[in-house]
Curated annotation (Swiss-Prot):
Belongs to the ATPase A chain family. This is ATP synthase subunit a. It is a multi-pass membrane protein. One of its GO terms (molecular function) is proton-transporting ATP synthase activity, rotational mechanism. F-type ATPases have 2 components, CF(1) - the catalytic core - and CF(0) - the membrane proton channel. CF(1) has five subunits: alpha(3), beta(3), gamma(1), delta(1), epsilon(1). CF(0) has four main subunits: a, b, b' and c. PROSITE patterns: ATPASE_A. Key component of the proton channel; it plays a direct role in the translocation of protons across the membrane. One of its GO terms (cellular component) is proton-transporting ATP synthase complex. Keywords: ATP synthesis, Cell inner membrane, Cell membrane, CF(0), Hydrogen ion transport, Ion transport, Membrane, Transmembrane, Transmembrane helix, Transport. NCBIfam families: ATP_synt_6_or_A, PRK05815.2-4.
Length: 250
């Protein structure tokens, strides 16, 4: 492993696809792991649902549990009407969860540890919420910025705050995922580096490496939990925003 804990987040060019307007278009390790994540998801869902059995096997169970888990989030947060967005929400959950899990494997790349990726996902949700809200509700969509029961004399201030918070949603939506994955992987790399450095000192070093080794195992287990938790948080926030677009006055 490289000594620098930030080295694992470096984007490297694998090959060039060409140039557009003097700007090089390259296929990077980040692109490769995005394709890998999509491939793993495709194999899981296609392999799990092909030749379905009454008593599901392991792959079928994972596929069905993933489907029901996301469907349950949508129904509880956005109601039955929100199921029209199931393909979007399910794709986001699976992509983030699988990308996070792949990133835990040593010598791999964590796609969600880069802000540009999480911002792109958050902006996708934001644009869909904005345009669908306007398409479905017209001008009534702006009721989202006018909470009910607010005294008239402070209503302008509240509306201003609501508008600002609405347009800042992509920031909080993206930074939360990015920061958690970045910090967790840095901590994991630091503890793992301690184990390697102490182990190189011989017997006494290995005795001293027991504590950082235990911490490495603990942080790895925590990162597996965080991988799912961050996918869940991103998904449930997406459902909340979609519910606001469908029912802006609620």
């Amino acid at each position: 492993m490289a000594a620098d804990p930030i080295h694992q987040f470096q984007i490297t060019k694998l090959f060039t696809l060409g140039h557009i307007g003097g700007q090089e278009i390259a296929f990077t390790n980040s692109s490769a792991y995005m394709f890998l994540s999509v491939g793993v998801i495709s194999l899981l869902m296609i392999g799990g649902m092909a030749g379905r059995q009454l008593v599901p096997g392991r792959i079928q169970s994972v596929a069905e549990l993933s489907y029901e888990f996301v469907a349950g989030i949508i129904r509880s947060t956005a109601g039955k009407e929100g199921m029209k967005f199931f393909p979007l929400v399910f794709s986001l959950f699976m992509f983030i969860a699988v990308s996070n899990l792949i990133g835990i494997i040593p010598y791999t790349f964590t796609v969600s540890s880069h802000l540009i990726v999480t911002v792109a996902l958050a902006l996708l949700v934001f644009v869909i919420v904005l345009f669908y809200g306007l398409y479905k509700n017209g001008l009534k969509f702006f009721k989202l910025f006018v909470p009910s029961g607010v005294p008239v004399y402070i209503l302008p201030l509240v509306v201003f705050i609501e508008v600002i918070s609405f347009f800042l949603k992509p920031v909080s939506h993206s930074v939360r995922l990015f920061a958690n994955m970045l910090a967790g992987h840095i901590a994991l790399k630091v503890f793992a580096s301690f184990v390697g450095m102490l182990g190189a000192l011989g017997f006494l070093g290995w005795m001293g490496a027991i504590l950082p080794l235990g911490l490495t195992v603990a942080v790895t287990a925590l990162e597996i939990l965080v991988a799912f938790l961050q996918a869940y948080v991103f998904t449930i926030l997406t459902c909340i925003y979609l519910n606001d677009a469908m029912h802006p006055g609620h």
